[in-house]
Amino acid sequence: MRLSRFFMPILKENPKEAEIVSHRLMLRTGMVRQQSAGIYTWLPLGKRVLDKVNAIIREEQNRSGAIELLMPTLQSAELWQESGRYDAYGKEMLRIKDRQDRPMLYGPTNEEMITDIFRSYVKSYRNLPLNLYHIQLKFRDEIRPRFGTMRSREFLMKDAYSFDLDRAGAEHAYNKMFAAYLRTFDRMGLRAIPMRADTGPIGGNLSHEFIILADTGESEVFCHKDFLGFDIPGEDTNFDDVAGLKTIFDKWTSRYAATSEMHDEAAFGAIAEGERLSARGIEVGHIFYFGTKYSEAMGAKVLGPDGKEHTVHMGSYGIGPTRLVPAIIEASHDDNGIIWPKGIAPFDVVVINMKTGDEACDAACGKVYSDLGKAGFDVLLDDTDERAGGKFATADLIGVPVQVIVGPRSIANGEVEVKDRKTGARETMTVEAAINKLVAAR
């Protein structure tokens, strides 16, 4: 992508309405634009990041055996009345009526709808286990939306729902998602710590929040430092291995970890002082096992191997991509801008032409741009007429992991400069060497 043809409306000044770093940087870089309170348009730069986040989520959900579908944003009130949650849910649920005066709602969550889909088609234990997921917009009418897309009214969610014959099967489904979430966040450059959580309005008796540490986090968290060194489940993880996944779950829940809402000061105090970690954190995922809460209320049953009807056991598993993007920024930035982890950066490499219009610079930039593109890189070529200092500032601000800097002096010697955005390390080498180095490191 040539920057001269890309839509990236960068703000020169920090927006006054932004309270936290991620909100400020997302507005400044032109990732998002606020349309009204808590409602945002994702502009091209932000959409590229969001798409890469969603791609990783999909890959790990599919790897774990979950199957994607897509449910609508509007739901019938009848399903919620059947489950008993229509009146119990607060004012954050947007209730509307269609032209036939039928009560509808803009879905804040999807337990009722997915249970209705399941009971309509699945009648036998032979069709279990089953895990269905979708990535869809939701709406919750927050009293005070704030922090940009971190806490907005309309937001994107990945919701997965598992169905099993009994609790043992449901716990295995829970452990699958537990391991999948660890892998998902790790691939985005995050160390997410699972913490026992309150089940809230979703219900159930087993729940974990996945928290990343960030100075501006909304929650105060307390945990053992061992979490910072635990191994992440590998790409070869066998999601059908009941014992293996239980081992992963047991390891990651063997140390103390809690947010302030669930904190036990006595249990935390029993940890050696040097092994305690107290910090701020941001929730990036939440998983629940809620047993038969919805299936019992809505008659979701299957015939078991004994020929009798069994009410299925369910779980739900959520990740908010539009919340995850600012959370990553909160955890990975410096005074100059965003530092994107490689897997989710809007572009893999930015080629900076310090003197657009110079024949040698244009030719070298064109070669790097073309060759890296053919090798599968997402490349941004800054071919604008902006001064060099402004180009460097823009590259740092938007956080592309690698910068290839092409200037008249260096290219006269057949060389370019390669800069690592995260470390600031710079290396001068030939054009061919730079291309080969980046391709080899991919």
From Swiss-Prot:
It is found in: Cytoplasm. Its main location: cytoplasm. Gene3D superfamilies: Anticodon-binding domain, Bira Bifunctional Protein, Domain 2. GO terms for molecular function: ATP binding; proline-tRNA ligase activity. The keyword Ligase applies. The keyword Iron-sulfur does not apply. InterPro entries: aa-tRNA-synt_IIb (IPR002314), aa-tRNA-synth_II (IPR006195), aa-tRNA-synth_II/BPL/LPL (IPR045864), Anticodon-bd (IPR004154), Anticodon-bd_dom_sf (IPR036621), Pro-tRNA-ligase_IIa (IPR002316), Pro-tRNA-synth_IIa_bac-type (IPR004500), Pro-tRNA_synthetase (IPR050062). GO terms for cellular component: cytosol. Keywords: Aminoacyl-tRNA synthetase, ATP-binding, Cytoplasm, Ligase, Nucleotide-binding, Protein biosynthesis. It catalyses: tRNA(Pro) + L-proline + ATP = L-prolyl-tRNA(Pro) + AMP + diphosphate. Signal peptide: none annotated. It holds the Pfam family tRNA-synt_2b. Coiled coil: none annotated. Belongs to the class-II aminoacyl-tRNA synthetase family. ProS type 2 subfamily. PANTHER family: MITOCHONDRIAL RIBOSOME PROTEIN L39/PROLYL-TRNA LIGASE FAMILY MEMBER, PROLINE--TRNA LIGASE. HAMAP family: Pro_tRNA_synth_type2. Catalyzes the attachment of proline to tRNA(Pro) in a two-step reaction: proline is first activated by ATP to form Pro-AMP and then transferred to the acceptor end of tRNA(Pro). This is Proline--tRNA ligase. It comes from Rhizobium meliloti (strain 1021). The lineage of its organism: Bacteria, Pseudomonadati, Pseudomonadota, Alphaproteobacteria, Hyphomicrobiales. The gene is proS.
